[in-house]
């Protein structure tokens, strides 16, 4: 799992960031390890970000993935649906506010409505652990160092994101994140860049020179010294 953190500074492009966050709902219904499921938003743009996410969710049509217009398909099994729903319920029990979703769609299949939980804190189970479903949690920060602290407060570190109005600032934040990959003002990975995680998100790298080395054999020849 990744439990990806997405940091938003006060001068970021909110629409661009929300477009990236919404991929959690639509891209494999959140069943992807690089999903930006933990939103860490500057307090000055918190309300606008939550409102924009709510408005965006209204376009996330749930249904058969083979049908035109469907943006959110089912999760893989009934067991996994129940697991994701338990994460949502734990967030509610811990005091999170359900902005959208939180309920099971009235249709056959293993569907979960795109869910947005606001008012979250880093001690909540739904914030700390990987639900692996269409669930986004939002926390606020009061500055870059606080945002970095919240982002790094995780057992995982696969893919993180920074949306900022200043490129130098974005790079400075990225270099302090305990994450194997960081994307700046985008959610798209670079296919030539090494891919892998820190902490419980794994060891080793795929892609790039590092990925090729993983498929190579290393021979050591020893001689008397």
Give the predicted meaning of each segment:
Residues 1-121, 184:
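ALDH superfamily catalytic-core signature
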Residues 6-7, 12, 61, 88, ...:
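Conserved C-terminal structural/oligomerization subdomain of aldehyde/semialdehyde dehydrogenase
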